[in-house]
Structure formats: structure tokens, C-alpha cells
Amino acid sequence: MITDTFSRKSEYSTNKLRKRLRRLVGTAIADFNMIESGDRIMVCLSGGKDSYALLDILRNLQAHAPLDFELIAVNLDQKQPGFPEHVLPGYLSEINMPFRIVEQDTYSVVKRVIPEGKTTCSLCSRLRRGVLYRVATELGATKIALGHHRDDILETFFLNMFYGGKLKAMPPKLVSDDGCHVVIRPLAYCKEKDLAAYAQLVQFPIIPCNLCGSQPNLQRQVIKEMMQQWNKKYPGRLETMFTALQNIQLSHLADTSRYDFVGIKPHGIATEEGDKAFDEELLPDSPVGMNHDDAASELDEACSTEAVQGGTI
């Protein structure tokens, strides 16, 4: 009886989470015009939770959306020691997904250049990016899809602000630095914890990301922990911060290259949007980015935890 109840609850949670993730991906794709009819999309698959979820959701979209587009999964085997070469080909063959495994020994290059015990992620990423751009050209891909999510975007924003002195995040859609490809991030509106929960429920064959032995990026880890503490103490803060990235007012920053502060003159016309220079701005009591789904998600999580701790499941 307990097993049946748990099974039903698990199935309900999986379906609810799947629908939410699909809706968020669909919204991001529509907002940024990420996918167009006739696209050939190269989905970069690392074997981690995010790229698995990305491929899974895009396959569902391909089956049900009115747009006609192709998907091809690409994995870069960087020859890291212990990398399970059979996992991704087995999974992709099982789901009848066209794929290509690219073998390129970037691991040896990184180990030769970066001192032992240092973070190798930056160089590894640059080498991987170059290979993937080349493969995208060979495949005739019109878009390159990456599995970065909302938390990645916010982390990058704070990394650039705190350590780089720039207001710069990770765009949901951009032209690649070689100028030849359009890169999209369909998971831009998805929370990392939702993707982690989905991967666990669906049981993707996850490949560990630390096979290279690299030390963690300490700066990114500091930012990640800061965001986790904020979210725990002030629920909804991350949603509000992400909303802020979509609501930029250049006239209220201080970048003279982006806004003509030099040419400002009074125009004699009162506007509701005008700045009340001497007034403290009234802010809403509830976080701006918090919506019904976010609140429901928090409640579901709290109820599930309470049920488990209370022994009702």
C-alpha cells in the first residue's frame, strides 16, 4: 500500500514537473525566437542532467510543435580518464536519436598547459567551443543548443559584476564569437533544482562532470553558495533578480557609452515614467518575479519534505 502510494505520488510529481519544464522552454523559445521552421539544431550533450533534460524536452517539442525542425545530438569525447564511452551512444540509440560522437583529446592539452591542482574549466571550455563550432559547420547546423539554465545565467551575472566590473550575464540567444553560428539556451527560464529533480525522476544515465580531476571554480562556487543562502532566507529573490535582467533601464545606470547623459535637457513634459529624483521609490511587498508556479513549487517541495519526515509516505 505504501509502495503504491509512493509510486502514484512519484508519477504525479514527474508529470507535473515535466509539464512545467516544457512550458518554460516553450516560452523561452517563443520570447527569443530560438527555433524557426527548417532549423537543423545541434544539441550539445555532455551527459549531465541539464543537457539530458534539454534533449528530452526538445524532442517532445519536435513531436508536437507546428514547426518542422531537425535535431542531432553531439557529444565531445575529450579523452578524460574513466569517461564511459558506451553510455551516450547506448542511450541515444535506444531513443532513436540521430547523434555524432566527436573524439578530440583536449584533456592532454589542458593537463600540459594548466598547473596541477588549478582549475582547468576555462581553457577546457574554450577548446571545446572551438571543436563544437567546427562540427556545427560540418553538420550544416543552423542553431547550437546549450543546456545552461536560469541559475547559470544569474551566476554569470554576479561573477561579471563582482569580479569583472561588468553588468553582463549569459544571453538566451547570441551569435557565436566566430560570427558563424547562432547559439540558443532553451533552458534559460528553468531552475537548476527542477532540472535536477527531473533527471532523478526520469533516471537519465548521468556521467560525472569531475572526471578530469579539475579543482572547482572557487569564484563560481562562492556565487552559487551566496545565491543558495539568499533563496533559503528570502524565497523569490532569485526570481526577482532574473526579472531584473529583463527590465533594464539604461537611463538609470551610469554607462555613458550606452546612454546620452551629456545631451540630457529638460523638455517641459511631465511623464509617469519620469524619475522622482527626491522620492524613495515604492517597491512591492512580494518579489516581482514570483509567480503562481514558483509558489506552488515551493509548497509542493515543503509538503513532500514534511510527508517524508512525518512518515506518511
Curated annotation (Swiss-Prot):
Question: Does the record's keyword annotation contain tRNA-binding?
Answer: yes
Molecular functions (GO terms): 4 iron, 4 sulfur cluster binding; ATP binding; magnesium ion binding; sulfurtransferase activity; tRNA binding
Q: Where does [4Fe-4S] cluster bind?
A: 121, 124, 212
**GO-annotated cellular components:** cytoplasm
Compartment(s) where it occurs, according to its Swiss-Prot or TrEMBL record? Cytoplasm
**Its EC number(s):** 2.8.1.-
Q: CDD domains, per this entry? A: TtcA-like
Pfam families in UniProt: ATP_bind_3
What PANTHER family does the entry give? AMINOTRAN_5 DOMAIN-CONTAINING PROTEIN, SULFURTRANSFERASE-RELATED
Q: What does this protein do?
A: Catalyzes the ATP-dependent 2-thiolation of cytidine in position 32 of tRNA, to form 2-thiocytidine (s(2)C32). The sulfur atoms are provided by the cysteine/cysteine desulfurase (IscS) system.
SUBUNIT field: Homodimer.
Q: What name has this protein been given in UniProt?
A: tRNA-cytidine(32) 2-sulfurtransferase
Q: What phylogenetic lineage does the species belong to?
A: Bacteria, Pseudomonadati, Pseudomonadota, Betaproteobacteria, Nitrosomonadales
* Gene coding for it: ttcA
